[in-house]
């Protein structure tokens, strides 16, 4: 125990630890920068994945044009420009609940969860077909 913890304990002040701190991470008023052209929504953190870099390349985008959010964060997003969304989830209810938060949607791509998508050639082909549609 450090000095601060001991002092709080002596004063009778309870310390609380968040059970799921990632839920609160950046949860209030996420404003989307002007350079963002794609928002990925996934329960996993995919921002540093080489596969995401390949998807961005197929969309003629760079890493700085992509914003990766989770399903808890998207409801707090503020977007003013037309944008593409890529929703990664096998849960169709979760996707249906998320669609109203896809503001200024130019296109919405859907894929299974990131874990499934990485190893599923059919899912990759389906994403490619979605990208090719006007």
UniProtKB/Swiss-Prot annotation:
Q: Which UniProt keywords apply?
A: DNA replication, DNA-directed DNA polymerase, Nucleotidyltransferase, Transferase
- Say which family it is in: Belongs to the DNA polymerase III psi/HolD chain family.
Tell me what reaction this enzyme catalyses.
DNA(n) + a 2'-deoxyribonucleoside 5'-triphosphate = DNA(n+1) + diphosphate
Stored NCBIfam families: DNA_III_psi (TIGR00664), PRK06856.1-1 (NF005335)
Instruction: Provide the GO biological process annotations.
Output: DNA replication
Classification of source organism: Bacteria, Pseudomonadati, Pseudomonadota, Gammaproteobacteria, Pasteurellales
What species was this sequence derived from? Haemophilus influenzae (strain ATCC 51907 / DSM 11121 / KW20 / Rd)
Q: Which SUPFAM superfamilies match?
A: DNA polymerase III psi subunit
Q: What is this protein called?
A: DNA polymerase III subunit psi
Q: What general EC class does the enzyme of this chain belong to?
A: transferase
What EC number(s) would the UniProt record show? 2.7.7.7
Its biological purpose is as follows: Part of the beta sliding clamp loading complex, which hydrolyzes ATP to load the beta clamp onto primed DNA to form the DNA replication pre-initiation complex. DNA polymerase III is a complex, multichain enzyme responsible for most of the replicative synthesis in bacteria. This DNA polymerase also exhibits 3' to 5' exonuclease activity.
Subunit organization: DNA polymerase III contains a core (composed of alpha, epsilon and theta chains) that associates with a tau subunit. This core dimerizes to form the POLIII' complex. PolIII' associates with the gamma complex (composed of gamma, delta, delta', psi and chi chains) and with the beta chain to form the complete DNA polymerase III complex. Interacts directly with the chi subunit (holC).
A molecular function GO annotation: DNA-directed DNA polymerase activity
Q: Which Pfam families match?
A: DNA_III_psi
